[in-house]
Design a protein with these regions (language model features):
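Helix-start/capping segments and mature chain N-termini
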Residues: 1-123
């Protein structure tokens, strides 16, 4: 990773409202300050590999009542997901409302509310 470039990009955005998503060969890896959870048909998915498995994601995988599957998450398939969640120590659990560049918009908050409820137990 090119840390100077990442830090430069982070300075240009409001990290409270935006996130930089990393990808390689059209496969999503993680956010610059978060891990990502994707929701499709009430099932949870995380990227298969090549990312840092953060503390918050580790906690959630052990405590939420849902199985999380590791798969390759392709940028071209974002339209399949009803929710995309950011999880991290600094942000907690956040539901992405839209990704304008991909014409993707959240269509549900169901899993977000459920996971946030579980996460709130440790706050």
């Amino acid at each position: 990773l090119q840390y100077k470039k990442i830090l430069s990009l982070q300075k240009k955005i409001n990290l409270q409202k935006e996130e930089i998503l990393f990808y390689n060969k059209s496969k999503i890896l993680e956010g610059s300050t978060t891990n990502l959870i994707f929701v499709k048909n009430n099932q949870l998915f995380i990227p298969k590999n090549s990312y840092y498995f953060g503390i918050t994601l580790s906690y959630l995988t052990k405590t939420i009542p849902y199985k999380i599957k590791k798969i390759d998450i392709l940028i071209s398939n974002f339209y399949e997901y009803s929710e995309i969640l950011l999880v991290g120590s600094g942000k907690g659990v956040v539901s992405i409302s839209s990704i304008d560049q991909l014409n993707w918009y959240r269509s549900s908050l169901k899993m977000y509310k459920s996971i946030l409820k579980e996460y709130s137990k440790v706050l």
